[in-house]
From Swiss-Prot:
BP terms from Gene Ontology: protein import into mitochondrial matrix
Species of the source: Emericella nidulans (strain FGSC A4 / ATCC 38163 / CBS 112.46 / NRRL 194 / M139) (Aspergillus nidulans)
Protein name: Mitochondrial import inner membrane translocase subunit tim16
Lineage: Eukaryota, Fungi, Dikarya, Ascomycota, Pezizomycotina
Gene: pam16
Keyword Transmembrane: no
Record region (Disordered): 30-49, 114-135
C-alpha cells in the first residue's frame, strides 16, 4: 500500500514539474522572439536603459542635431542637478542615478555620431597608401 502512495506522489510531482518546465520554455521562447524583433538584448545596450528623448528631458537640453550638441550645457545641467540631489543634502540617490544615466546616454549618442562621421569621412577620402618611396 505504501509503495502505491509513493508511486502516485512521484508521478504527480513529475507531471507538475513537466508542465511547469513546458510553460517556462514557452515563455522564454516568446521573450526571445520579442527581443529579436526589437533588437534588444538581456545584457543591456549602449542606451543604458534610457531613451535619448528621456535623457534630454531629464537634463532639459535639446536633442543632438546631426550628432552635434552643446556638451558644456549638458555638463553644467548635469552638475547642478547631480549636486541638488545629493543624498547627504536630503536628495534622492534614485534621481542622481537617473541624471547620471541621462548624461551618459547623451554622451554616448554624440560619441556614436562622431565615430560615424569620422568613418564616413575616411570612406569619402579613401585610403591612399604610398606605394613608391620616391613619389
Amino acid at each position: 500500500m505504501a509503495h502505491r502512495i509513493v508511486t502516485q506522489v512521484v508521478v504527480t510531482g513529475a507531471r507538475v514539474f513537466g508542465r511547469a518546465f513546458a510553460e517556462a520554455y514557452k515563455q522564454a521562447s516568446a521573450a526571445s522572439k520579442y527581443q529579436q524583433k526589437t533588437g534588444k538584448s538581456a545584457g543591456g545596450s549602449s542606451s543604458s536603459g534610457i531613451t535619448l528623448d528621456e535623457a534630454c528631458k531629464i537634463l532639459n537640453v535639446k536633442p543632438p542635431q546631426a550628432g552635434e550638441t552643446n556638451l558644456e550645457q549638458v555638463m553644467e545641467r548635469f552638475k547642478k542637478l547631480f549636486d541638488l540631489n545629493d543624498p547627504q543634502k536630503g536628495g534622492s540617490f534614485y534621481l542622481q542615478s537617473k541624471i547620471l544615466r541621462a548624461r551618459e546616454r547623451i554622451e554616448a549618442e554624440v560619441r556614436e555620431a562622431e565615430r560615424k562621421a569620422a568613418h564616413e569621412k575616411e570612406l569619402k577620402e579613401g585610403w591612399k597608401p604610398k606605394v613608391y618611396k620616391d613619389r
